[in-house]
Amino acid sequence: MILLVGLGNPGEKYARNRHNIGFMAADGIVRRHSFSPPRARFQGIVSEGTLDGEKVIVLKPTTYMNESGRAVGEAMRFYKLTPADVVVFYDELDLEPGKVRMKTGGGAAGHNGIRSIAAHIGPEFRRVRIGIGHPGAKDRVLGYVLGDFSKAETADWVETLIEAIADAAPLLATGKDATFANKVHLALNPEPEKKPKTKEKDGDE
């Protein structure tokens, strides 16, 4: 069993914020793989299903971002999981928009949701870092992450990324994190088709 956690802030006001892309990823997985209807549990919203034969719990903490660890810790203890069974989806300022990187352990890099989870279960959980880009100046970060994705961003990469994450999610259930990241990358950056080589014909002289 694994616990997939999407980070964000609860409520319609925040639903389309850049900071909520973790919630969007979680919702995409639930939709794509026909998980159970969401219900309130563990200070969050929970859906259950299977991915590649593995039981999976999807959790969206409703504690607000800064207290996300309370929900994650409660769910992890209930299911008797280890941090290695926990995969967290969250927004990453230090990655270009649409880039996805996998990581296990490490620091929080200023992300309050990650800091809270590490405080409750330790740092050795698996992380899906979803790039949202940086506004360029530190004093603009708060307004940027709590701002909505533009229509152009949504059409250009957000929708494609959420679909790609949902499509590749079974790889996370079986521990193939690097393959997951590569599959998502290729969905957003398809390799150009190689044209078959044609033999040059000798021209008339």
Curated annotation (Swiss-Prot):
GO terms for molecular function: peptidyl-tRNA hydrolase activity; tRNA binding. The record marks 91 as: Stabilizes the basic form of H active site to accept a proton. The active site is at residue 19. InterPro entries: Pept_tRNA_hydro (IPR001328), Pept_tRNA_hydro_CS (IPR018171), Pept_tRNA_hydro_sf (IPR036416). GO terms for biological process: protein quality control for misfolded or incompletely synthesized proteins; rescue of stalled ribosome. Its EC number is 3.1.1.29. It holds the Pfam family Pept_tRNA_hydro. TRNA binds at residues 14, 64, 66, 112. GO terms for cellular component: cytoplasm. It is an enzyme of class 3 (hydrolase). SUPFAM superfamilies: Peptidyl-tRNA hydrolase-like (SSF53178). Keywords: Cytoplasm, Hydrolase, RNA-binding, tRNA-binding. PROSITE patterns: PEPT_TRNA_HYDROL_1 (PS01195), PEPT_TRNA_HYDROL_2 (PS01196). It comes from the Bacteria. The record marks 9 as: Discriminates between blocked and unblocked aminoacyl-tRNA. It is found in: Cytoplasm. Hydrolyzes ribosome-free peptidyl-tRNAs (with 1 or more amino acids incorporated), which drop off the ribosome during protein synthesis, or as a result of ribosome stalling. Monomer. Belongs to the PTH family. PANTHER family: PEPTIDYL-TRNA HYDROLASE (PTHR17224:SF1). HAMAP family: Pept_tRNA_hydro_bact. This is Peptidyl-tRNA hydrolase. It comes from Parvibaculum lavamentivorans (strain DS-1 / DSM 13023 / NCIMB 13966). The gene is pth.
